[in-house]
């Protein structure tokens, strides 16, 4: 009885390990993932895609790698959930940017940054402008959740 229990435990462990690995050879890619929605954003360096879970991301990558296609790497969820806008100031209703208490001198050096508030994603000329932008948003009545944060220190 003890050896049967041990055998079943070992088989269960092997099945668990096998089911959670990503295969790049001729064995089948894992196709079963738990029905738990815990979204993960992935990027292949050019595109962004939202997956229902990490398991779904791994399964998708297994199939992509077999076809010699770049795999997706998990990244900040804002890449998948936010809309890229060209003119953020206009999109937010043209609030007043020239607010005296928000004025902070920023260099004229162009070092683009990508920012997001979870809903919108945009580019600013540099990170100093992000502070001025958020201050002006707060003065205009924006809630803390509506403020922007740095997504990456380069173009979106």
UniProtKB/Swiss-Prot annotation:
GO terms for molecular function: serine-type endopeptidase inhibitor activity. Disulfide bonds join 29-62, 33-55, 102-135, 106-128, 114-156. The record marks 35-36, 108-109 as: Reactive bond. Keywords: Disulfide bond, Protease inhibitor, Repeat, Serine protease inhibitor, Signal. Residues 23-81, 96-156 form the Kazal-like domain. Residues 1-19 form the signal peptide. The keyword Disulfide bond applies. It comes from the Eukaryota. This is Enhancer of split M1 protein. It comes from Drosophila simulans.
């Amino acid at each position: 009885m003890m050896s049967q229990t041990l055998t079943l435990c070992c088989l269960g462990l092997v099945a668990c390990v096998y089911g959670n690995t990503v295969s790049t050879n001729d064995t089948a890619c894992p196709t079963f993932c738990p029905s738990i929605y815990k979204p993960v954003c992935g990027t292949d360096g050019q595109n962004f895609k939202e997956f229902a879970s990490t398991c779904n991301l791994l399964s998708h990558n297994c199939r992509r790698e077999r076809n010699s296609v770049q795999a997706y790497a998990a990244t900040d969820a804002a890449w998948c959930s936010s809309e890229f806008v060209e003119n953020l100031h206009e999109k937010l209703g043209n609030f007043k940017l020239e607010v005296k208490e928000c004025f902070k001198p920023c260099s004229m050096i162009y070092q683009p940054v990508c920012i997001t508030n979870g809903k919108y994603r945009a580019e600013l000329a540099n990170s100093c402008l992000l502070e001025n932008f958020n201050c002006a948003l707060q003065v205009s009545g924006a809630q803390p959740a509506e403020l922007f944060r740095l997504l990456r220190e380069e173009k979106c």
